[in-house]
UniProtKB/Swiss-Prot annotation:
Protein name: Uncharacterized protein YpmT
Gene responsible for this protein: ypmT
This protein's UniProt keywords: Cell membrane, Membrane, Transmembrane, Transmembrane helix
Organism: Bacillus subtilis (strain 168)
Pfam families: YpmT
Subcellular location: Cell membrane
Length: 64
């Protein structure tokens, strides 16, 4: 189960990097609506990553 949380965290981090990269390109093109949308997706996936790290640690302390 620990490995599932690690893979899910890595996947969500990859998605957040992708949306951050898209936000940067929309900022350079001055398309502010798409930039803010991509920043919010980036923040969403970063929060999912932090949550899954917390779940992994919480599961570890529950077993001991």
């Amino acid at each position: 189960m620990k490995r599932i949380y690690q893979y899910f965290s890595l996947l969500s981090f990859t998605f957040s990097l992708y949306f951050g990269w898209l936000a940067y390109h929309h900022l350079a093109a001055e398309d502010m609506d798409q930039m803010y949308l991509n920043v919010s997706y980036c923040a969403l996936f970063l929060s999912v990553m932090v949550f899954t790290f917390g779940m992994r640690d919480r599961k570890k302390t529950d077993k001991s």
